[in-house]
Amino acid sequence: MAEDLAKQLAGYKAQLQQVESALTANGENEDLLKLKKDLQEVIELTKDLLSSQPSETADDACDDMSASGSQSWKVGEKCMAVWSDDGQWYEAEIEEIDEENGTAAITFAGYGNAEVTSLLNLRPVEEGRKAKEDSGNLPMSKKEMIAAQREYKKKKALKKAQRIKELEQEREDQKVKWQQFNNKAYSKNKKGQVKRSIFASPESVTGKVGVGTCGIADKPMTQYQDTSKYNVRHLMPQ
């Protein structure tokens, strides 16, 4: 996971350099500016995901050890679970269990809210109700706190990964638009080119019609003598 993220980060940085290079020639292009902003955001998100990898890996071993001694739960079983929004205990039903990650997908009874939580955050209904009546909430053990923190990090990482996915899709859309723009511009320029003859009329009043060298290759153009020094009177009889 970390290795893949590192490769993606290097790719994003290389793309950002290309965009910044293009902006030096076209600094007001809205598509390029949007692309630069998206790349900067996805780079920061990827860095955050990379920095969270070691702590999550370290927590895995702790959670696996804790889950092995926890109660065995079944799909469809009623339980008491902590709702992540307020940290309070509510009655819920187990919809799915992920033994590998030590988590369960639950739905809170009467509310319909669903979320994924650690198996360590579940309690039998009677035990949970009694504890809730006695203290209003169950104190979390150190292992439970670690599990809760890990769940928070997981959810945060999932949100970041989803945002990265959205930004990548936006970049793909921008890339297609940019390619279409370049193709259209190239086609327009190519179509507008006119092959001019060297004998075409000059575009300005001071222009001269060119004299070709067809048939006399490697020879200089014809030189004309300046006749301005001759006066008409020289041609008149004395």
From Swiss-Prot:
PROSITE patterns: TUDOR (PS50304). Coiled coil: none annotated. GO terms for molecular function: RNA binding. SUPFAM superfamilies: Tudor/PWWP/MBT (SSF63748). One of its GO terms (biological process) is RNA splicing. Residues 72-132 form the Tudor domain. It holds the Pfam family SMN_Tudor. Associates with spliceosomes. The Tudor domain mediates association with dimethylarginines, which are common in snRNP proteins. Belongs to the SMN family. This is Survival of motor neuron-related-splicing factor 30. It comes from Xenopus tropicalis (Western clawed frog). The gene is smndc1.
